[in-house]
Amino acid sequence: MDRDAAHAALRRRLAETHLRAEIYKDQTLQLHREGVSTQDPRFVGAFMAAKAAHLELEARLKSRARLEMMRQRATCVKIRVEEQAARRDFLTAHRRYLDPALGERLDAVDDRLADQEEQLEEAATNASLWGDGDLAEGWMSPADSDLLVMWQLTSAPKVHANGPSRIGSHPTYTPTPTGPPGAPAAPLSRTPPSPAPPTGPATDPASASGFARDYPDGE
């Protein structure tokens, strides 16, 4: 707070000196424009007052400039100090990265990770070969199809000894020319009936073999 008040007082005195120098300078120029002689006490007094205010103003300006330069340099130094402090704090917080052996440890970790990645890739490859394999032909593999067929066979109904489908078993219905009950009727055949075999002597087996001729009485 005292520093701010001192700076405000310096600025106020500088402003007052600048205003006083301008007033005395204008009075001197006004007397000169009016044709007052430089030997006139009025001119001499105004000129000396203006000169004194001018010298004071220059001194205060130079002082203000020096102070401002010092303030700027102090600000630069402060910034540099703050930067160094921040760098020191950062390095202190990460001092483990400053270990000379850190590079070797990082290389060792990279090698170990690479080996583990290769092991994982090999395990994934083996799992793919052992598993379902390529699913381009569908999600069921040949082994899956065989397993499904086995399930179908084992779940099929068994044939009993007296079952209707066993060879030689008695039918469960009365045979009819049209087949079992519920079966569709056989279609009518369009083939003409075969002629009855002739009953003449030419077709008699006994006559043809001469048996009747040799044994006329059937003996």
Curated annotation (Swiss-Prot):
InterPro entries: Herpes_UL14. One of its GO terms (cellular component) is viral tegument. Residues 161-219 are annotated as: Disordered. It is found in: Virion tegument; Host cytoplasm; Host nucleus. It comes from the Viruses. Pfam families: Herpes_UL14 (PF03580). Keywords: Host cytoplasm, Host nucleus, Phosphoprotein, Virion, Virion tegument. Changing P201A: In strain: Nonneuroinvasive mutant HF10. Residues 177-200 have a biased composition (Pro residues). Phosphorylated. Belongs to the alphaherpesvirinae HHV-1 UL14 protein family. Contributes to the nuclear transport of the viral transcriptional activator VP16 during the early phase of infection. Therefore, participates indirectly in the regulation of the immediate-early gene expression. Additionally, seems to be important for efficient nuclear targeting of capsids. The UL51-UL14 complex regulates final viral envelopment for efficient viral replication. Interacts with UL51. This is Tegument protein UL14. It comes from Human herpesvirus 1 (strain 17).
